[in-house]
Amino acid sequence: MAKVQYYGTGRRKKSIARVRLVPGEGKVLINKRDEEEYFGLETLRVIVNQPLVLTGTKDKFDVLVNVYGGGLTGQAGAIRHGISRALLKADESLRPELKKAGFLTRDPRMKERKKYGLKKARRAPQFSKR
């Protein structure tokens, strides 16, 4: 018999997370590593688990994640987005609370490009009057 799996793709800045929810006891594996090992900071682990805690499904699913690109904070946001989308496929009735918390919204903020004549996106070279 085929196992029931729910897929979701999440994005944040330059990070892309492919999330798979499998019925289980609440383990989170990120790139084949435990979440404590992958994310050193507690705040990042909290971000990843927010949709599961909010919907009360923390102990119902094992979360298997492939994530690449960007930094750790962007990856945590992408995983949260992906888990939220996968939870919707598992149970559509969770949509109102996930939407109210803002977990289904793709954060549109991206890094601003560097402009020529400037040191960074907006930082101008030091101005000297004389």
Swiss-Prot record:
Residues 101-110 have a biased composition (Basic and acidic residues). Gene3D superfamilies: 3.30.230.10. Residues 111-130 have a biased composition (Basic residues). Keywords: Ribonucleoprotein, Ribosomal protein. One of its GO terms (molecular function) is structural constituent of ribosome. The keyword Hydrolase does not apply. SUPFAM superfamilies: Ribosomal protein S5 domain 2-like (SSF54211). PROSITE patterns: RIBOSOMAL_S9. GO terms for biological process: translation. Residues 101-130 are annotated as: Disordered. Belongs to the universal ribosomal protein uS9 family. This is Small ribosomal subunit protein uS9. The gene is rpsI. It comes from the Bacteria. It comes from Clostridium tetani (strain Massachusetts / E88). GO terms for cellular component: cytosolic small ribosomal subunit. InterPro entries: Ribosomal_Su5_D2-typ_SF, Ribosomal_uS9, Ribosomal_uS9_bac/plastid, Ribosomal_uS9_CS, Ribsml_uS5_D2-typ_fold_subgr.
